[in-house]
């Protein structure tokens, strides 16, 4: 029997550190205003959102710190800036809600993942509150206990 072809993942980049550094209160999907060379690079998977965050200027949201590396075959007449700020495409209600929570509650907005939705590049942003060191340690303990518990359950099932 022939193997089934693997379905390519829609995920382009993940920010795993964000869930370790912050409590994620809310997640919102936003579009990105991209240039042509950036879309080509995203298709090749050359993106990093590890240090990216969202700021607000003139009533609009912008993604800072996201790196999209240009391809080697990119056009020479266009100057490609890998770390340029990119406008987020959100509706006014979402913008007002995020802006209010960031200014009033002292929260921040971080990029969680970058992915394809149909032919459009989307970024999942999270409304986040910073964790203290003891919170991070608590999360690590909980994760380790969960893994140990799963291992015990697996071995208990084999014993009979």
UniProtKB/Swiss-Prot annotation:
Keywords: Cytoplasm, RNA-binding. InterPro entries: SmpB, SsrA-bd_prot, SsrA-bd_prot_CS. It is found in: Cytoplasm. The lineage of its organism: Bacteria, Pseudomonadati, Pseudomonadota, Gammaproteobacteria, Pasteurellales. Gene3D superfamilies: 2.40.280.10. This is SsrA-binding protein. GO terms for biological process: trans-translation. Required for rescue of stalled ribosomes mediated by trans-translation. Binds to transfer-messenger RNA (tmRNA), required for stable association of tmRNA with ribosomes. tmRNA and SmpB together mimic tRNA shape, replacing the anticodon stem-loop with SmpB. tmRNA is encoded by the ssrA gene; the 2 termini fold to resemble tRNA(Ala) and it encodes a 'tag peptide', a short internal open reading frame. During trans-translation Ala-aminoacylated tmRNA acts like a tRNA, entering the A-site of stalled ribosomes, displacing the stalled mRNA. GO terms for molecular function: RNA binding. The keyword Lipid metabolism does not apply. It comes from Haemophilus ducreyi (strain 35000HP / ATCC 700724). The keyword Methyltransferase does not apply. One of its GO terms (cellular component) is cytosol. It comes from the Bacteria.
